């Protein structure tokens, strides 16, 4: 895990971050602002290290959360975060290009969809 760093966020949540895929305050705010409920079906697009789905799942959501990320490294970080946080199969990771989203995620399947694209 040399290329990754574990970051304890408190509340039993540990994020797996790297130079390429980290997160900022905006991701924490978006995860909360989305106001997901226990039985919502949720998807985060362009998930990076998976911080938003991770925060949702640690709120004891009953349903799996989908995370779409084009970067293999980002998906690897999410897999490690799922292991570290004992999420079992509750994090569904799609290593895909969002331009093809209709090919792998059916329309109307989700109650909540978020996206926090990178910016400078």
Features from the language model and the residues they span:
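Class I SAM-dependent transferase core
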Residues: 1-37
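Conserved SAM/SAH cofactor-binding pocket of Class I
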Residues: 32-120
């Amino acid at each position: 895990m040399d290329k990754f760093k574990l970051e304890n966020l408190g509340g039993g949540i540990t994020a797996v971050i790297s130079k390429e895929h980290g997160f900022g305050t905006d991701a924490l705010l978006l995860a909360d602002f989305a106001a997901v409920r226990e039985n919502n079906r949720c998807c985060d697009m362009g998930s990076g290290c998976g911080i938003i789905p991770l925060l949702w799942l640690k709120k004891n959501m009953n349903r799996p959360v989908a995370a779409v990320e084009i970067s293999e490294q980002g998906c690897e970080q999410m897999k490690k975060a799922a292991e570290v946080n004992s999420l079992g199969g509750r994090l569904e990771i799609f290593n895909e290009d969002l331009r093809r989203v209709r090919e792998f995620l059916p329309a109307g399947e989700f109650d909540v969809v978020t996206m926090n694209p990178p910016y400078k």
